[in-house]
Amino acid sequence: MQIIHTIEELRQALAPARQQGKKIGFVPTMGYLHKGHLELVRRARVENDVTLVSIFVNPLQFGANEDLGRYPRDLERDAGLLHDAQVDYLFAPTVSDMYPRPMQTVVDVPPLGNQMEGEARPGHFAGVATVVSKLFNIVGPDAAYFGEKDFQQLVIIRRMVDDMAIPVRIVGVETVREDDGLACSSRNVYLTPEQRRAAIIVPQALDEADRLYRSGMDDPDALEAAIRTFISRQPLAVPEVIAIRDPETLERLPALQGRPILVALFVRVGATRLLDNRVIGHAAPQITQERAA
């Protein structure tokens, strides 16, 4: 595996693969890799000739009072995991490599990015869309892989690619979970043992939402209220966002009527925000399928 730090070096390294018509699979990450990231890597390796992973903690997507400074970083550890996973290239730029001068160009996707998690984190998804579009321009991948745990992000990236005619296939990969159901996340490392035990309320709330919906609760306000009450049973958990939405458009639904719905949760446990979601209903939604730009 070759570790690359600069944009020009990466472009030079990928040039032979492009000339030979090889397909490039790309997995953008912020590092401190876990099982979910490695599943994205596995899919990319299976479906492409060349696999590239980026590790970049993007300051544009962190708010003033968020965890940019303490976000977990361990490049040596991550490089070892990616080497074992048989990744071809690791792109690990610095902030000065990616943003040599203050950015004046921003990619934003309102209103998709201003609701749900975006309501709690203003500007977050503009930062995500900006860095992902820049990485796509640098890498020029044939396919890019994103976890469905960050479902709103996946919808936004798909829409950005469609709107901007970026020639990359966006692949959503099912959420990978710990043995007790908690979604794998780099931020789980923040949790104390007590908080980690409490965090199981998040996937349990999704189970409860599924049960209630299947039992006939099809009023979105009632379902949101029931989920909030369920989470509030755990004193260490504070539900910040509970959203029932259309899984393709993220639009609010006046009535559910048995259709597939997205249940998105943004829950604070201690100082840690945990994100999780599930699509529930009677049929698989289009968003979970691979779609070409």
Swiss-Prot record:
Catalysis: reaction(s): (R)-pantoate + beta-alanine + ATP = (R)-pantothenate + AMP + diphosphate + H(+)
Chief location of this protein within or outside the cell: cytoplasm
E.C. no: 6.3.2.1
Amino-acid positions noted as binding beta-alanine in the UniProt annotation, renumbered to this chain: Q61
SUPFAM superfamilies the UniProt entry points to: Nucleotidylyl transferase
InterPro entries, alphabetized: Cyt_trans-like, Pantoate_ligase, Pantoate_ligase_C, Rossmann-like_a/b/a_fold
GO molecular function: ATP binding; pantoate-beta-alanine ligase activity
Subcellular location: Cytoplasm
Binding site for ATP: 30-37, 147-150, 176, 184-187
Keyword vocabulary terms for this entry: ATP-binding, Cytoplasm, Ligase, Nucleotide-binding, Pantothenate biosynthesis
CDD domains reported in the protein's UniProt record: PanC
Superkingdom, natural source: Bacteria
A Gene Ontology cellular-component term: cytosol
Positions that bind (R)-pantoate: Q61, Q153
GO biological process: pantothenate biosynthetic process
Active site as annotated: H37 (proton donor)
Any Pfam family the entry gives: Pantoate_ligase
Pathway the protein takes part in: Cofactor biosynthesis; (R)-pantothenate biosynthesis; (R)-pantothenate from (R)-pantoate and beta-alanine: step 1/1
Other facts: The reaction proceeds by a bi uni uni bi ping pong mechanism.
PANTHER family linked to this entry: CYTIDYLATE KINASE/PANTOATE-BETA-ALANINE LIGASE, PANTOATE--BETA-ALANINE LIGASE
Function summary: Catalyzes the condensation of pantoate with beta-alanine in an ATP-dependent reaction via a pantoyl-adenylate intermediate.
Family per similarity comment: Belongs to the pantothenate synthetase family.
Subunit structure: Homodimer.
The protein's name: Pantothenate synthetase
The organism of origin for this protein: Brucella canis (strain ATCC 23365 / NCTC 10854 / RM-666)
Gene: panC
